[in-house]
Design a protein with these regions (language model features):
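Catalytic core of pol beta-like nucleotidyltransferases
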Residues: 1-100, 111-116, 125-185
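Short acidic amphipathic segments
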Residues: 101-107
Length: 185
């Protein structure tokens, strides 16, 4: 069992691609600096996070070159999906059934509002027609329409490298429904 604050820190570092210092981590996650320091020291010792010194501050980022880190991240991302509640869980179970996609991320208002107008989903695939057909069929059975954002893998990688706000927001706030390992690669 992974402690709650350790989970928070690993997920935060995974979702925020830039390097961050301990004060940013503790402020954004509402964890004491001492607790964050202790956790990060342990994660660094186990080679799950990398640190670098810039001036007087130490900056951290997730170590995705370590197989153990990737396994931890996959488990934590799967746990996030399992902990979905309400409408987001209902839609997630249906959307996960789509087979022609490497990566599926649920994002937007469905995750945090009871009053949502549509269900936003990112599909990483080379088969846009199948996605459109699937989403139209799902929209017919459910009360709210499923709005797909369809990208090819190369385009999504380019969006992230170019720090496009939409792609980064999806990574920061979205729930991975399928393809945790594809995301981590």
């Amino acid at each position: 069992m992974i402690p709650k604050n350790t989970k928070k820190i690993i997920i935060y570092l995974l979702r925020n691609l830039e390097i961050v210092n301990i004060n940013q981590i503790s402020k954004n996650l509402e964890i004491s600096v001492g607790s964050a320091f202790k956790i990060l020291k342990e994660l660094e010792k186990n080679n799950l996070v990398l640190s670098s010194n810039l001036g007087n501050a130490k900056f951290y980022q997730i170590n995705l070159n370590n197989e153990e880190t990737i396994k931890w991240c996959e488990i934590l991302l799967s746990e996030e999906r399992r902990n979905l509640k309400g409408y987001s869980k209902i839609y997630a179970e249906e959307i996960q059934k789509f087979e022609h996609s490497e990566l599926i991320i649920l994002f937007g208002s469905v995750l945090n509002n009871k009053d949502f107008n549509d269900v936003d989903v990112l599909f990483i695939t080379n088969k846009p027609k199948e996605v459109t057909r699937f989403c139209l069929n799902l929209s017919k059975i459910r009360t709210k329409p499923v709005v797909p954002l369809i990208l090819k893998k190369e385009d999504f990688i380019k969006e992230i490298k170019n720090k496009k706000e939409v792609a980064l927001n999806i990574l920061k706030t979205g729930i991975i429904l399928k393809g945790e390992s594809a995301l981590l690669k």
